[in-house]
Amino acid sequence: MPPKKTKTSTAVAREATESPMAERSRAPDALQADPPAPTQESNNELVDSRSLEEILSGIPPPPPPAMTNEAGAPRLMITHIVNQNFKSYAGERILGPFHKRFSCIIGPNGSGKSNVIDSMLFVFGYRAQKIRSKKLSVLIHNSDEHKDVQSCTVEVHFQKIIDKEGDDFEVIPNSNFYVSRTAYKDNSSVYHISGKKATFKDVGLLLRSHGIDLDHNRFLILQGEVEQIAMMKPKGQTEHDEGMLEYLEDIIGSERLKEPIQILCRRVELLNEQRGEKLNRVKMVEKEKDALEGEKNKAIEFLTVENETFKKKNQLCQYYIHDLQKRSRDKEAQKEKIQEDTKDISEKSNTLLETMKEKNKALKDVEKQLNKITKFIEENREKFTQLDLQDVDTREKLKHSKSKVKKLQKQLQKDKEKVDELKNVPANSQKIIAEETNKKDLLEKQKEKEEEKLKNVMDSLKKETQGLQEEKEVKEKELMEISKTVNEARSKMDVAQSELDIYLSRHNSALSQLNKAKEALNTASATLKERRAAIKELETKLPKDEGDLKKREKELESLVSEEGNIKNQVRELRQKVEEARSSLSANRSRGKVLDALIQQKKSGKIPGIFGRLGDLGAIDEKYDVAISSSCGALDHIVVDTIDTAQECVNFLKKQNVGVATFIGLDKMKVWEKGLNKIQTPENIPRLFDMVKVKDEQIKPAFYFALRDTIVANNLDQATRVAFQKDKRWRVVTLQGQIIEQSGTMTGGGGKVMKGRMGSSVMVEISDDQLQKMENKLKTDTTRATEIQDRKAHLEEEVAKLRQATREMKNTFEKYTASLQSLSEQEVHLKAQVKELEVNVAAAAPDKNQQKQMEKNLETLKKEYEKVAEKAGKVEAEVKRLHKLIVDINNHKLKAQQDKLDKVTKEIDECASAITKAQVSIKTADRNLKKSEEAVARTEKEIVANDKSIEELTEDLKKLEEKATTVMNECKEAECSLPEVQEQHRSLLQEIKAIQEKEHALQKEALNIRLNIEQIDSHIAEHQSKIKYWQKEITKISLHKIEDIPEEVLPGLAQEELEAIKDPDQIINQIALLEAKSHEMKPNLGAIAEYKKKEELYLQRVAELDEITNERDSFRRAYEDLRKQRLNEFMAGFNIITNKLKENYQMLTLGGDAELELVDSLDPFSEGIMFSVRPPKKSWKKIFNLSGGEKTLSSLALVFALHHYKPTPLYFMDEIDAALDFKNVSIVAFYIYEQTKNAQFIIISLRNNMFEIADRLIGIYKTHNTTKSVATNPKIIAAKGLAEMQSVGCA
């Protein structure tokens, strides 16, 4: 949407705001002015590059109205204004509440009426100057009573309502809000919306969203400015100025189309300029195209003549091919007759082939068997290696078990020490028993005293419990005596058992250890002996086998080297033989003339012949077409001198063989200066430098044939380099197109010439030389076979020797490494055996003493069991008697019984301590038993370890047995291997014999083949000529001529070829056509140039059409937008002017006013004129009216704009100042009618105005402070009328 223009008055526009203070981050003081539109000059420079769719899509839709005139529609109203220290308002002053429709502010001059408007302007963001102050800090109240006030604040409270009948209305829920602004002493200010801090932009967006016209300020008419709306000029004089046209267009909304229209206009102008340039280019290219048409037609005529020549050449070539094919078929029939004689030789050869297949099959079977045996041997060797690894592992385990013996011995010693410690526990416990027994005795005495006291108490009860008590005392004495006996018996029995166990354990343990040590010693000694013997044997055998291995490896290395050399010789020789055969075959297929001359050279009659020039050199295949097309002398024959050339000519004439052209090398010396390399345009290659020769003296002949012809990649490059400023060059392209130094162009087309020079130099060779080479090849092939057989045999022997040597080295290293450990183990075991024998002797038990100890233990057990049984019976009887006594005396003897119980408890604790000590003795006995058991377990573990050593030793024996079995099987397989190898050699010899027979048959077939080859040479000569003429046909192609249907060379039928009797007639026709074409000298490049110009012309025309279409689319869019803008503007303009007329007639009671277009055809060119006809006067321009008439005209326009685009609020300051009382009344009544859908707040001193208002806000000033009071005149009038009526009635 186009930016808004800067306004020029408070009624129409707004000024820029003061900048805020950065330190408080407060909002700006007023609406920011939009940047000015660019000038016309800058617009012309800045061209919008967007597409048409982007420009049109960027146009916003017409702005919707913020409110409508419909009844029941919601609208905004101001409820009240709160001023705090603002201007003349000291402290907090509430103005209002305002009526929803028509409120008047009245008061004497100087009381602060206009400060109400100023407060609203302050909140709406006006500058201080517009609030009649130089700066914001001046707005803060300052009086004698209120000095040094730091800030002022104004709050304007709003709400949205829906009108109802009369003064009633409905407030829309949650629609209340207020906007406030606070100014400070430092001239900064800050905004709030409903108490939340905000920027002025937020305030502007909020108020605009509710329909307050902050852009045009139609809601605000200040004192003395009412007539300025109508006084605007018809149109702004500058880009930044605003007149009636811009003012109305802003309100109507058509101004949003102004900038897109300007953009489209500039684009149309630019596209017109570009189209003019394109049109000029089209005309220029068309002129150049027409200028080339004459040259093009001459070139087409030349190509037409050449096409006729090519057709005749095609006819002649087809005739030659037909004649040669006929001769070749005759030779083929002769060859078939000879080939029937070769059937017998073929049958013999097939028989030998079948035999060879059988022998080869048998050879494969033997090789399979040989591989199987070899694989079996390798597998067994691998098994032996695995067994060897298991042997090492087992020996390590054995070593670990032996080291474990020492650890077990240490553990056994610890367990024995613990047994000794536990044996001291009974003595300590006996000491505790003695101490607790003494204490118990003292408590027993005390108990007797307490019992005595209890006895006195029990006198009265003595008869009841006397018998039981006496019986209990007897039993307790008996129990004490028996308990001592039981404890003594049990202690004696435990001691006897421990003594017996300890006495017997030492001898058993020592004997077991001795047996294990002896067995380990025997095993270690045997192993050490075996390994020493094996090491001694290996020290003799290993060097011998290593020597044999080195000898065979050296022989094998020599054979491998010789085999590589002989294979390379055979491969190179076979390649040479093939090349010689191919060369001999090619020589046989040469032409008659060249073949006859070569035969003269070989016979020595004419030795100075070198050969055909094309055969004496070679060139990369990339340049084949180029040299074949550009060098006609490739078929010339090179000789040493001119005399030799003359001899050759005489020979050909004499023999009537044919004709040939010769090059004498003695005359070529003048060209030697051209052999050096030269500088070429763009450094492209010279064709002569690309030719390779074997004989350097041939080079001048090639330079004579080629000169300084250079090779270009394509025709464009050839055209570019052919004509230099200082020199013209002969250029040939890789496609065969030639540009002569004269400027003529030849060659090219669909068919190209190639194959006249090979990629290698041809070599002359005889049948004898070929035979010698074949014999040498045969000898070398036989030697290669012999070397291969010997190498295979040596590889087998070397593999076996390497395996055996590797195994012996591993065994030697392993046995040598184990000698030291085995020796140390043997010494250690011998010392251990001696020590254990001494221990066994010392630990041997006395048989008599052992029997005596066992007998004593059995006696003590019986005594203990007998005493324990008797004590148990007495203890049970004591408990029974005690329970009976307690049951009888419990309720009578409680106090004394408690004392007795306490003593008894202490006695029991002593008894418990004694029991614990006794239990400790018993526990010590049990722990002693456990420790002794641990000793026994350790001894068992030592036994198990010894057993493990035995088992590992047994495993070692088994592994050795398995290894022996594997080695025996391997030896058996190795014994059977020579027999199979002998079968293999025998089959190879038989196959060799068959191959010799096959070679004999091949020699026999050679004679027949030579006969066939003679026939083949004739056939090949014919086929070569056929290929030559077929190649010539491939070189012939018709030129493709623009705008003429493409022709194809015709193929002649058999009858047409037979009908040709004299080919010389065709040759003469070809000569006439070639002479005609040589005379024409056309510029063939004109066709391509004409074609390029024609394509360029069509391209330029397409570009012209494209830009024309683009120009037309922008022009249509431009016209459419202009019409849309005009239609939108005129629709709104008609509504406004009609309503203006209606309003003015009503306000003036008969006058007339209208907005008229200065230019009736284009309202945007000259603008809008405001014309008025006051009542009973003629039409006048607004400038010529009186003050009151201007005021009425302006109000009529304001109300017309309100009708077109309603705004909810209006503030007017003494708009009736220039009106008489009659017009004031008319305006007042009109405003009252207009307030049905808007809120009017008017400052007025005219009673005709404020008496009609719905609410009056009275402003008065006392003590330099403005105050206010709100009244409702209609209510007051109604009350006064009611009072008057009541008084009148009274």
Curated annotation (Swiss-Prot):
Keyword Cell cycle: yes
The entry's keywords: ATP-binding, Cell cycle, Cell division, Chromosome, Coiled coil, Cytoplasm, DNA condensation, Mitosis, Nucleotide-binding, Nucleus
GO cellular component, one term: cytosol
Span list, region Disordered: 1-48
Compositional bias of kind Basic and acidic residues: 15-27
GO molecular function, one term: ATP binding
Pfam families: SMC_hinge (PF06470), SMC_N (PF02463)
Primary site of residence: nucleus
GO biological processes: cell division; mitotic chromosome condensation
Matches recorded under InterPro entries: P-loop_NTPase, RecF/RecN/SMC_N, SMC, SMC_hinge, SMC_hinge_sf
Purpose of the protein: Central component of the condensin complex, a complex required for conversion of interphase chromatin into mitotic-like condense chromosomes. The condensin complex probably introduces positive supercoils into relaxed DNA in the presence of type I topoisomerases and converts nicked DNA into positive knotted forms in the presence of type II topoisomerase.
Domain remark in the UniProt entry: The SMC hinge domain, which separates the large intramolecular coiled coil regions, allows the heterodimerization with XCAP-E, forming a V-shaped heterodimer.
Protein family according to the UniProt entry: Belongs to the SMC family. SMC4 subfamily.
Subunit structure: Forms a heterodimer with XCAP-E/SMC2. Component of the condensin complex, which contains the XCAP-E/SMC2 and XCAP-C/SMC4 heterodimer, and three non SMC subunits that probably regulate the complex: XCAP-H/BRRN1, XCAP-D2/CNAP1 and XCAP-G/CAPG.
Protein name (Swiss-Prot/TrEMBL): Structural maintenance of chromosomes protein 4
Species for this entry: Xenopus laevis (African clawed frog)
Taxonomic lineage: Eukaryota, Metazoa, Chordata, Craniata, Vertebrata
Gene it is expressed from: smc4
